[in-house]
Amino acid sequence: MNISVLASGSRGNCTLIHDDNNAVLIDMGISTRKLKQALAQLHLNIEDLDAIFITHEHIDHIRGLKTLTKNYNVPIYSKTATLKQIAITQKFTDINLKKLPSTYN
């Protein structure tokens, strides 16, 4: 497993966890263009993403989420309250938002 910090700080947060078969983003606080560039350096593309997990709704964690979801159908997971805030503040409709289960096995 590899962990690649694509961006960190108040201007955007985005971390990729990946191996040979799976790729998951933690937060999408960068533009889709910057994400494409960062993934290309790792020999990946957006279509390789299996999911995006959003830790919370602050803009530095979701800045590029709306644009990404307009063009790609990557499932987005987070807590119910976070998903509701994102839907309201970012005016999201018809995107692939998924509620995380409240317990994990």
Task: Identify the function of each model-found stretch.
Residues 1-42:
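Conserved beta-strand hairpin/beta-sheet module of binuclear metal-dependent hydrolase folds
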Residues 3, 76, 95-97:
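Generic structural signal for residues in well-ordered beta-strands
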Residues 11, 31, 58, 82, ...:
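A generic "binding-loop/recognition-motif" signal
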Residues 13, 22, 48-50, 72, ...:
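A generic structural signal for short beta-strands and their flanking turns/coil linkers
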Residues 28, 78-81:
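Short beta->alpha hinge that forms the Motif I/post-I loop of the SAM-binding pocket
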Residues 33-79:
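Active-site metal-binding motif and surrounding structural segment of the metallo-beta-lactamase
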Residues 80-105:
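Metallo-beta-lactamase
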